[in-house]
């Protein structure tokens, strides 16, 4: 049994360099919701040094709301924005001797792509046109991962240790009760169940089947680093191999 651990980095609110010792994939903000040129360069350099798979974390151009405000934009504008951000991060990866291996949209773009086919297609098209060898990280069971596969991309289904789920496999919106799981012991138990049992309990009590291929660990809490270590240690103690999906070791130098 195997699993990938990913974290959203370069957002200016966590211990990015230390977290890269614990995760196997890094989703690096591309400056549109957080971060910037220096943060991108630093995170890429650290990922290359530590052999962590490098991923782009594009978003809507919305730093005021940390990229979490849903937007109604033309597909062509979404396509152009994603392509722009991929190009920016790829330049830093190339300069540091690495390459981008995957793409995970951020915030509202992630959530809307999961349920709105037109947005999913725009994001997938930008990724495919930039580099069809890139993998796509998306919400498990979502239309976004289906769209990626239909376009011939590798889709990696993502689950969350600290988010509440609805019975259809979607995430409980952050504005609603049950959206966030705060208890570390519960998060740990949920993660092990998602990885070993391939299921999660919804806020309404049902078991929801999931194809857990990568687990997102949010790195912006005060205890994020310690909890990431607990998760990694628990997975390895359970005999689960923790590494980037497939051969996506983009942090390694050529």
UniProtKB/Swiss-Prot annotation:
The keyword Oxidoreductase does not apply. Gene3D superfamilies: Glycoside hydrolase/deacetylase. It is an enzyme of class 3 (hydrolase). InterPro entries: Glyco_hydro/deAcase_b/a-brl (IPR011330), LamB/YcsF/PxpA-like (IPR005501). Keywords: ATP-binding, Hydrolase, Nucleotide-binding. Its EC number is 3.5.2.9. Transmembrane segments: none annotated. GO terms for biological process: carbohydrate metabolic process. GO terms for molecular function: 5-oxoprolinase (ATP-hydrolyzing) activity; ATP binding. The keyword Cell membrane does not apply. It catalyses: 5-oxo-L-proline + ATP + 2 H2O = L-glutamate + ADP + phosphate + H(+). Catalyzes the cleavage of 5-oxoproline to form L-glutamate coupled to the hydrolysis of ATP to ADP and inorganic phosphate. HAMAP family: PxpA (MF_00691). Belongs to the LamB/PxpA family. Forms a complex composed of PxpA, PxpB and PxpC. This is 5-oxoprolinase subunit A 1. It comes from Burkholderia pseudomallei (strain K96243). The gene is pxpA1.
